[in-house]
Amino acid sequence: GVVPAELGADALGGAINLVTDKGTQDFLDASYSFGSFNTHRAALNTQVINKRTGLFMKLASFYNYSDNNYWMHSNPKYDAAIQVPDGNGNFVEKSVRRFHDQYQSGMIQAEVGFLNKSWADVLAISMLYNQHYKEYQTGARQSVVYGHVNRNGKYYMPSIRYKKSDFLTEGL
C-alpha cells in the first residue's frame, strides 16, 4: 500500500510506525527467565520523575548468560559426522555435549536530567557500560576444534541529550 515518505519511500508492502513512550510516569519493570542449557536472562528498568522540579533519574539494565552445552549428533543427510578417538587409535561416531561455548553479556545505563523547563524540553546526561564474553569451541565447521579461544570486550559511553522546541525561533 501507499506509505508516507517519513516512514520510508521504498517501503514495499507497508510499514509499521512504532511510537515509543516518552516516559512521563514513574515505573519499575523487572524480568527474569531461565531456559535450557543453563540460560538466564534478567532485566531491570526504572524511572523516577519529580513533577515539581522536573528532575528525573532512569536506570536500564540487562544480563544474559548461557552455558550452550547442548548435545551434538552426527547427521549423515548433511555429511556431518562427529567422530571421537576410542583409545585404540581409531575414531568412532558418537554424540557429544558441547563444551567451552559459554556466553554472557550485560549492560547498564544510568541517566539523570531535567524535563519541561523553560530552557529545555529535555536535558540529560547518561553513562552506559556494556560487557560481553563468548567462548568458542569450533569455527564455522565442526571439524576444527579450538582450545580455550574466547572473545570479550567492554565499553563505556557517556552522552548528553538536549531537546528544545522552538529554539531561537518558532518551528525550529
Predicted regions and their residues:
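N-terminal periplasmic accessory domains that precede
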Residues: 1, 6-33, 40-46
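Extracellular loop and loop/strand-boundary signature of outer-membrane beta-barrel proteins
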Residues: 29-32, 93-98, 141-150
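Short glycine/serine/proline-enriched coil/turn segments at secondary-structure junctions
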Residues: 6-8, 24, 36-38, 53, ...
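Flexible, surface-exposed loop regions and adjacent strand-edge segments
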Residues: 74-83, 139-148
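Transmembrane beta-barrel wall of Gram-negative outer-membrane proteins
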Residues: 38-66, 78-133, 158, 164
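Hydrophobic helices that insert into or interface with lipid environments
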Residues: 24, 154-156
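Long, internal scaffold/assembly segments composed of regular secondary structure
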Residues: 156-166, 170-172
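Switch/connector loops and helix/strand junctions flanking conserved nucleotide-binding motifs
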Residues: 8, 67-72
